[in-house]
Amino acid sequence: MNLIDQIENEQLRSDLPLFVSGDTIIVQVKVREGERERLQAFEGVVIAKKNRGIGSAFTVRKISHGEGVERVFQTHSKMIDSIKVKRRGKVHQAKLYYLRGLTGKKARIKEKLQIRK
């Protein structure tokens, strides 16, 4: 293992939950306002996820005041305080870019139900 890989592996976060495209998540982001720092929640559907080691990222989409808002988060960023999975979505695609063109009830995603044994 070379030096660059070793440094990247030290910076990877292991406290993040497992989530996939279609899941509704709440991301707590650290926001600096002057000298203060506070947490801001961003809740939406994961429409894309890119797994590239330290360069991993995911895109979250939500509807705010009738307008679609998308935000790309770096998975291992220090600006992300926590991620909470609110509900699991049942989808067949890895990238849900088709949701950009849908509004209202057409943009809903079915919930994946856990089967107890």
From Swiss-Prot:
Name any GO cellular component annotation.
Answer: cytosolic large ribosomal subunit
Please list every transmembrane segment annotated in the UniProt record, as residue ranges.
none
Query: A Pfam family name for this chain?
Result: Ribosomal_L19
**Biological processes, Gene Ontology terms:** translation
Keyword Ribonucleoprotein assigned: yes
Q: Which UniProt keywords apply?
A: Ribonucleoprotein, Ribosomal protein
Recorded GO molecular functions are: structural constituent of ribosome
Q: Name the domain of life this protein comes from.
A: Bacteria
What the protein does comes down to: This protein is located at the 30S-50S ribosomal subunit interface and may play a role in the structure and function of the aminoacyl-tRNA binding site.
The record ties this protein, via HAMAP family, to: Ribosomal_bL19
Similarity field: Belongs to the bacterial ribosomal protein bL19 family.
Q: What is this protein called?
A: Large ribosomal subunit protein bL19
The gene name on file is rplS
